[in-house]
Amino acid sequence: MGLFERYLTVWVGMAIVVGIIAGSFAPEIFVTVASLEYAHVNFVMAALIWLMIYPMMVQIDFSSIKDVGKNPKGLALTLVINWLIKPFTMALLGWLFFKILFAPWVDPQTAKEYIAGMILLGVAPCTAMVFVWSQLTKGDANYTLVQVSINDVIMIFAFAPIAGLLLGATDIHVPWDTLLLSVVLYVLVPLIAGVLTRKTLDKTDDHSTLNAFLKIMKPWSIVGLLATVVLLFGFQSETILSKPQAIILIAIPLLIQTYGIFALAYWLAKKFKLPHSEAAPASMIATSNFFELAVAVAISLFGLHSGAALATVVGVLVEVPVMLSLVWFANRTRHWFA
């Protein structure tokens, strides 16, 4: 894990502070950025999100899908949790906390937006950071690669229907044209671009050209994330300064969801008698979120100033320290799978 990944929470925290200060003292900058929009797509945010997502797609070798039959139990475990359990538990927790438990502190419209942001996080399984978590737990690299590749392909077809279903079920209006456009812009097109780039660059046996390209692009992916956080918290600065408790309220159900899903996945992996090299990455993949996609879709559907966008960024803030704690736990319990 590099310097940026290891201290990502610190960098995100600093970006949050910069965004809030800038939003308070130079709001005209954010008004200008917000005006650069067409068909619910903000050009500045779209460019930054592409900067985050495109390098991830280049990193993934989709030809690994041919090895899908080599780890059937681990793959089945993660796919079931990612697509049949996690989105629904996230929606349930969002509804429970913001419609009932936190109702005295959050107005109904804002509560809907927070729930929407949580749902978008729950429907987007993690992509790039999974390789880091797998490496830190000494996971099977081939299994991890196959699982991520399959998830990304499924995401093209399943993200919009599941997100639309859950948003509709929680009484949130779903602009389907914008949702489908978001999937095309932030999943399908970057995926195709990543595949073509990888095919063009990866023509040597030692992958030297591809590795050099990825080394150049990796820092820019983090820059895109941090710039996105600065902008989002700049747009949200007035709300956050007047209601700082909002971040804590959003973080609570996200923490419960993350630890709960990991516990379920890890327990099932033990029941299925998976080796630790599959159990650990399977549980990490099941637990973590593709927060870059969630942020992009939240902005497209609900706007830069929305509670949904804020909720997805809180997801970024929460995920890294939580996942590092789960890496520690997985490494300490390796003997459970002996």
Q: Where does each model-flagged region fall?
A:
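Alpha-helical transmembrane segments of multi-pass small-molecule/ion transporters
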Residues: M1-V58, S63-T287, F291-A338
